[in-house]
């Protein structure tokens, strides 16, 4: 019997073997090509063959200890050899057989076994390690364990740090990439991301407005040329005149200037060491719309009508609303565009911006006529029955309709038709769009109301701006603040303010706060100060920028309430206190400083009560309305912030337990019945 292991391999031997080819081991020398395909099986006991061509043969060798002595003592003993006589080239079939019998180099290399071993070891131990830090997640180590829906486990601090690095969002598993539960993704949201969700509601984009007529030559550019009478005597030519305006043109240019006036009273509101602060009312009036021949064509307007169709507008008030809308439609021209929005317990846009052609006017009348008494609009798909919705949401939608339009007319306006009180109609102070409120509770003659509507639609001044300054003989004063008194009080600026567009003969009131040094002369008389006003606007009829000459206005002598018996002084002081408090509180609300705004409003109300005003006074009622609005806004903000639980160790532990239970339930439902008993193996 042969001892040891036998190894079979292929090699090449020469056809003729010489005695010199016999090696010391008693084996025939192997001579084959140096490019042998299986050279990696060569060992020190298997000698290399010389260069030459030979046939491939299969031989068997027994490596025993006695083989050496036998071959050395008996040189003529025949060798144990097994030859296969084949051709010099192997067939593909033989090659495939050899490749199957021969193991690959990669499978027997130590590096491959090490890599395979490490992979198997990672798969076995990955279920007990954190998928982020790769540390143990065994219980009892004092660290909360988070189990995802895909059954991967993590340390809870690792998950929170990973979410913080991704802006507090963890949408997928860090190991397998599967999506997590919605409550996991939305669990830790900062307060800065909650605020836009409260403010910005899901408002659609209103860019479906009807296109304007685009013609190369605008009809507004034509001016009628007056024909002279043939029988009229021809005047003699007197030469060319340079820049000689006609009397009609000069009168039109003079009438197109903005009128600015100051009130005859000025009240001191604060005084200190070396200075005093007083306020004065300024009234700005736009010029009338020109009615001369060639100037009668007004600028096209984009109008949004906001209709209050709540339950309170039933019966006669609803008919008044319809009649008012018919008057508005009759004053619109073909180039004007109209959109209708109705609101009650909810708001909806009933029609997009459409040109008031014959079809557009007919469609608008049909929408107005189908408004029923209970407040529901048939065929529109919205129920307007109910109470309690603020008009502010409808105004925001109206402003959005004008902001999202694709093509724009040079003038825009919003009409609000309602019977609510003045403090219930919210004016958007930050919007440049003029908002006009039409009270349905006041009976106005139809002809007077038509003139008012026509005046609202006639743009007289576009993009009006004022530059204010103080000129004094004995001391230089300064304008500290300018507040708007038309509509909702708002802070406009200091010296340079912007009033925007104004319709024909529109008048706006401004409250100007001035700070100047005190005159310490022996006479004690205050020096008269002069206010300079520089206006700048665009003429809507010609689209020319106009810069009229500066105006000098004499500021009245400021007086205190104690030194004057004029009731207008005390009224002006109270107006300054309430207006300043409301305007500054809104600036604080925009910065989310609710406590400071509430403190400012309550202190102003206490000061007015101390001055002797009753609760029925307009200033007190305005402050009460602002305090109520502030409390409602603050309540919504607090409710939204408290809806999300603060992230504490206790809440984090509870959240982790809740999510782990959900993951285990889903895992139990998806368990394969054939693997019963292996559900904890986490396949």
From Swiss-Prot:
What catalytic activity does the UniProt entry give for this protein? S-ubiquitinyl-[E2 ubiquitin-conjugating enzyme]-L-cysteine + [acceptor protein]-L-lysine = [E2 ubiquitin-conjugating enzyme]-L-cysteine + N(6)-ubiquitinyl-[acceptor protein]-L-lysine
Q: Give the species.
A: Arabidopsis thaliana
Return the broad EC class: transferase
Please state the gene responsible for encoding this protein: WAVH1
Indicate whether Metal-binding appears among the record's keywords: yes
Q: Quick check: keyword Transmembrane helix in the entry?
A: no
Q: What does this protein do?
A: E3 ubiquitin-protein ligase involved in the regulation of root growth. Acts as a positive regulator of root gravitropism. Possesses E3 protein ligase activity in vitro.
Q: Where are the zinc fingers (RING-type)?
A: 130-176
User: What highest taxon heads this organism's lineage?
Assistant: Eukaryota
| Stretches that traverse the bilayer | none
> SMART domains annotated for this entry?
RING, VWA
> Which UniProt keywords are listed?
Metal-binding, Transferase, Ubl conjugation pathway, Zinc, Zinc-finger
VWFA domain location: 302-438
Record-linked PROSITE patterns:
VWFA (PS50234), ZF_RING_2 (PS50089)
A GO molecular-function annotation = zinc ion binding
Q: What GO terms describe the biological role, i.e. biological process, of this protein?
A: gravitropism; protein ubiquitination; root development
| Tissue expression remark | Expressed in root tips and leaf primordia.
Q: For this protein, what is the EC number?
A: 2.3.2.27
How is this protein named in the record? Answer: E3 ubiquitin-protein ligase WAVH1
* Upper lineage: Eukaryota, Viridiplantae, Streptophyta, Embryophyta, Tracheophyta
């Amino acid at each position: 019997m042969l001892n040891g292991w036998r190894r079979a391999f292929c090699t090449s031997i020469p056809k003729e073997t010489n005695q010199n080819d016999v090696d010391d081991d008693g084996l025939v020398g192997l001579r084959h090509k140096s490019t042998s395909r299986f050279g990696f099986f060569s060992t020190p006991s298997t000698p290399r063959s010389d260069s030459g061509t030979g046939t491939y043969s299969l031989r068997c060798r027994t490596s025993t200890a006695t083989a050496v002595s036998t071959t050395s003592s008996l040189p003529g003993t025949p060798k144990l050899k097994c030859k296969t006589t084949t051709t010099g080239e192997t067939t593909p079939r033989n090659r495939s057989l050899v490749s199957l019998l021969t193991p690959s180099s990669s499978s027997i290399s130590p590096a491959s076994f090490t890599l395979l071993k490490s992979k198997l070891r990672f798969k076995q131990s990955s279920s007990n390690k954190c998928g982020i830090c790769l540390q143990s997640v065994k219980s009892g180590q004092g660290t909360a364990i988070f189990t995802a829906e895909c059954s991967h486990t993590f340390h809870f601090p690792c998950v929170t740090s990973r979410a913080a690095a991704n802006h507090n969002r963890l949408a997928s598993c860090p190991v397998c990439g599967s999506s997590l539960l919605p409550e996991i993704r939305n669990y830790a949201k900062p307060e800065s991301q909650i605020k836009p969700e409260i403010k910005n509601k899901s408002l659609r984009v209103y860019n479906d407005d009807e296109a304007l007529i685009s013609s190369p030559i605008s009809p507004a550019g034509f001016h009628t040329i007056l024909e002279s009478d043939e029988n009229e005597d021809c005047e003699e030519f007197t030469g060319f005149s340079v820049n000689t305006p006609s009397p009609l043109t000069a009168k039109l240019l003079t009438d197109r200037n903005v009128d600015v006036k100051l009130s005859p009273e000025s009240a001191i509101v604060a005084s200190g060491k070396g200075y005093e602060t007083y306020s004065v009312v300024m009234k700005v009036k736009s010029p009338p719309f020109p009615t001369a021949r060639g100037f009668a064509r007004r600028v096209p307007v984009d109008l949004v009508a906001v209709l209050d169709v709540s339950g309170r507008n039933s019966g006669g008030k609803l008919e008044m609303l319809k009649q008012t809308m018919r008057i508005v439609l009759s004053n619109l021209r073909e180039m004007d565009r109209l959109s209708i929005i109705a609101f009650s317990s909810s708001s909806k846009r009933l029609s997009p911006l459409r040109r008031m052609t014959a079809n557009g006017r007919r469609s608008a009348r049909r929408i107005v006529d189908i408004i029923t008494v209970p407040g529901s609009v048939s065929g529109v798909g919205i129920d307007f029955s109910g109470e309690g919705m603020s008009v502010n949401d409808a105004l925001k939608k109206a402003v959005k309709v004008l902001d999202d339009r694709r093509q724009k007319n040079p003038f825009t306006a919003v009409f609000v038709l309602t019977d609510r009180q003045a403090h219930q109609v919210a004016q958007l102070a930050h919007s440049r769009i003029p908002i006009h409120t039409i009270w349905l509770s006041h009976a106005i003659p139809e002809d007077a109301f038509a003139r008012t509507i026509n005046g609202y639609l006639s743009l007289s001044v576009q993009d009006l701006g004022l530059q204010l300054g103080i000129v004094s003989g004995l001391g230089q004063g300064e304008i500290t603040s300018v507040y708007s008194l038309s509509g909702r009080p708002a802070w406009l600026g200091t010296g340079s303010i912007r009033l925007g567009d104004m319709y024909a003969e529109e008048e706006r009131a401004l409250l100007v706060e001035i700070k100047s040094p005190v005159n310490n002369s022996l006479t004690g008389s205050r020096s008269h100060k002069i206010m300079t006003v520089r206006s700048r606007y665009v003429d809507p009829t010609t689209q020319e920028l106009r810069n009229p000459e500066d105006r000098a206005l004499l500021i009245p002598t400021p007086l205190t309430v104690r030194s004057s018996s004029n009731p207008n002084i005390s009224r002006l002081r109270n107006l300054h206190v309430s207006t300043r408090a409301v305007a500054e509180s809104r600036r604080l609300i925009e910065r989310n400083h609710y406590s400071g705004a509430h403190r400012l409003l309550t202190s102003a109300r206490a000061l007015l009560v101390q001055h002797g005003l009753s609760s029925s006074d307009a200033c007190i009622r305005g402050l009460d309305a602002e305090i109520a609005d502030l409390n409602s806004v603050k309540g919504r903000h607090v409710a939204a912030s408290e809806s999300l639980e603060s992230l504490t160790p206790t809440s984090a532990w509870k959240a982790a337990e809740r999510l782990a239970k959900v993951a285990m339930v889903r895992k139990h439902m998806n368990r394969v019945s054939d693997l019963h008993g292996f559900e904890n193996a986490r396949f």
